[in-house]
């Protein structure tokens, strides 16, 4: 079977399969997995996130249609019942540990951008994430709308977000920005 590097394969290159598998063993809970691995779950969830899939059935059909690409990523299609069971029973700490491992790698590998500022420069931004009012009644921000805000403090020298917070949709960007602990003398834009 001929192999072609896909954009998704290139996106996954910073994630070492060996590191992922060792973290998966550390964060495993319950019986041994028979029909699917945590790598299959990760690939399936990543592909579904990037292709805006909205249901388990949609994820399953997308993965089945991409079998040849999954093969080259070392994964196989995963049934919706298996994916639901893995999402429910296996702890999320695997992905949290993988995130922090990638973040530490990114902070050491990144080249510093030169600025004329003597002090560190940070960009503060917030994005509203719309939610369904029926499913998330706790996130009500208007009579017919529910949302949360994702606040990010980006270090412009390393281009890595150093501060992240989630708040209700009504909260001002400045209120959350004042709660971030920026280094003394920083310039915040």
Where are these regions (language model features)?
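Conserved, well-structured functional cores that handle cations and Mg-NTP chemistry
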Residues: 1-189
């Amino acid at each position: 079977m001929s192999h072609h590097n896909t954009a998704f394969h290139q996106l996954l290159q910073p994630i070492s399969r060996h590191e992922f598998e060792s973290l998966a063993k550390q964060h495993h809970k319950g019986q041994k997995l028979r029909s699917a691995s945590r790598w299959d779950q990760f690939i399936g969830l990543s592909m579904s996130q990037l292709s805006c899939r909205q249901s388990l059935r949609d994820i399953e059909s997308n993965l089945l249609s991409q079998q040849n690409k999954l093969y080259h990523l070392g994964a196989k299609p995963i049934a919706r019942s298996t994916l639901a069971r893995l999402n429910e029973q296996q702890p999320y700490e695997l992905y949290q540990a993988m995130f922090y491992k990638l973040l530490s790698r990114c902070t050491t590998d990144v080249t510093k951008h030169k600025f004329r500022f003597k002090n560190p420069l940070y960009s503060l931004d917030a994005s509203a994430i719309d939610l369904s009012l029926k499913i998330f009644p706790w996130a009500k921000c208007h009579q017919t709308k529910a949302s949360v805000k994702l606040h990010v403090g980006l270090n412009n020298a390393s281009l890595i977000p150093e501060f992240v917070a989630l708040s209700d949709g009504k909260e001002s960007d400045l209120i959350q920005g004042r709660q971030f602990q920026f280094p003394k003398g920083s310039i915040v834009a």
